[in-house]
């Protein structure tokens, strides 16, 4: 497909990146998926995404939330590939697809009219993938456009762009190749305001794995000031994307339909609840402890239902919703007017912090991090690189060495619930913590291990994801991982409202769960002492001024320094690796020797692993990683590998205590070194006695002392048996060496002497199994066919 045939109507957004060129994003509609309420094809380069928005006919009155669903369908044909699964078709969504769903949902959800209860589904299908252009940001814009066309009560359009900081400049929609040179990668979504400004609605950002190296080479570190400048730099691109979407909507959008809106409560219910319980709620919100505070609020709720139930019969849900709204109002008012939070802290105060490492036995690394009632256990496991995760997605990455898993069991909030496979929220939190630490991880060469980090949220009252960042840093250092710098994270909140005719914003440091629920923003920031490594912004507003976000970044920086001090008091440098962790040794061999180390059908490498107890992983460039839980096993495996691929070549006259590995009619093959065999001819086997059958003297597995008699031009080795002193010379050559058809009769045997020093030329038999100097016997007469 090309841009010209993707739809009947189309509009284009052109974004100028100066020296980095222009990016053209095209929105087309009217040809594909015409039965959906709204559909659009968005294209960037050769990346093509189809977005279809549909809406349920009947509202779900029983729901007390907006039933919006976003699905991303990664089609492997988009990259010209067949799925690697058993059934050769796409199955459950990949982690990349789930994270893209969350990227789309976060700016989209607050843009719908409040109280909408009709089911809305947005399905994104990746039809074609340009290796240079990721599909995720294209999908956000496509979702906004298809929803704008659908006739739903939607306040969009929403524009989204990826911004990369490259050579001191911010580049919109960078290619994969350009991202290799970036110190910071940021996805920003927002909407254009009537005054021409842009309100930021969502941010997902991280430093790259190359950041530390690039900064050491002179690039600008992604400090709070640099990140804030990136938010400003994203505005022109967002404005242009919103313009193109608005123009297409003017000619192709359906009229906005009337949908029933279900308010949580009516004004009379709210007024009755406020008159009865406002003072009690205000007192309850002064209780610092979460459990005690919630218990007091539950008592107030029970009294409200009891006292007002008869008056509002059948409307008990309204009373509960009104009480929640009253609680939210009191929390926000107290912060805005008195600068006092639920637990009595000021806007910049952090809850009590504790950090401890080495809390579990036997595991490779462990740590416990607590911030108030939020408690995270971090556990680190190290293994061979062959245990890294293989990826079968549309992403250009095919494996992942660092894996971060986040678990949020129901008991962490004192509740019951389902325990099992991770939900989208858990996948998203784990990915955020993973991205926060990737920039400070050692390279494969510096630390040749696969690393799995697990964060167990044992207690939750605000920002378990940022607690996971702190616990992970501690756990990794406890396991002996040489991080380039420790990383800490903090969650920031926002309360905003009209106060004396002006909009006032108060940024909160280290938010509680209730402040997250009642506030306007969840802004998570992670980083080192020097720069930001990851951040994530979710908002319930239509947008937040960028200067407010810039101030929040600076406030987060101050909090991060405090947390890092507590963490460094627990552990300052990487600890000694656990006795239970594998020790990995690196061996470099010539690429053409890889096959020798592996052996036929893996026999050689399997034998080394079985006999030494070590694990061996071989890279395509000839790097071999040898891992074992004890030093002698690893050293034995390294010596075996070196003997094969980096050997000290044997010389004529060298003696070995070898092992018989194969017998034939003409002699025995003796293993001298791993991968190095020699032929002990039948005439040399019997210590001067005539030998009719090799097996009468030697069998597979027998040990025999031999001396190298000759090495021919092809490297094949011929052996003499080392005989005890005074023993007779070897028997005459085997009968198979005599010309056929001659009868010796009773003639005395002819003394042929010892032929060990005779030039053998290329007569050495070939074993045929890849070993040195081996093979089957051959007839003397050969016919050459031309």
From Swiss-Prot:
A GO BP entry: RNA processing
Biased composition (Low complexity): 727-738
Region feature Disordered, mapped onto this chain: 722-786
Residue ranges with Basic and acidic residues bias: 739-778
Cofactor: Mg(2+)
Catalytic activity as recorded in UniProt: RNA(n+1) + phosphate = RNA(n) + a ribonucleoside 5'-diphosphate
UniProt-annotated location(s): Cytoplasm
Family: Belongs to the polyribonucleotide nucleotidyltransferase family.
Protein name: Polyribonucleotide nucleotidyltransferase
Gene: pnp
